[in-house]
Amino acid sequence: MASDLGFSPPEVPEPTFLENLLRYGLFLGAIFQLICVLAIIVPIPKSHEAEAEQAEPRSAEGPKKPKAAIASTNKRPKKETKKKR
């Protein structure tokens, strides 16, 4: 029936390589975002083995000294001078 009326199919150019790359890159980006959102929403319970491994290195390091106390002992005291007016 369309051929009887003289209609022809629309002329749509083939997508170029960059257009295809952009299209599939956007799809992959959207899928990655969905995975990230689902990872935030759905909590995954941690196993007890992973918690034990993380606790051991912390106790092996020992207590750390604050950096501020170390920095103040290394500085030389400044000379005190009176301002001349």
Curated annotation (Swiss-Prot):
Biased composition (Basic residues): 75-85
Membrane topology, as annotated: Single-pass membrane protein
Keyword terms, alphabetized: Membrane, Transmembrane, Transmembrane helix
Amino acid composition bias (Basic and acidic residues), ranges on this chain: 49-64
Location of the protein in the cell: Membrane
Pfam family membership, one: UPF0239
Superkingdom to which the source organism belongs: Eukaryota
Recorded family membership: Belongs to the UPF0239 family.
Name by which UniProt lists this protein: Protein MANBAL
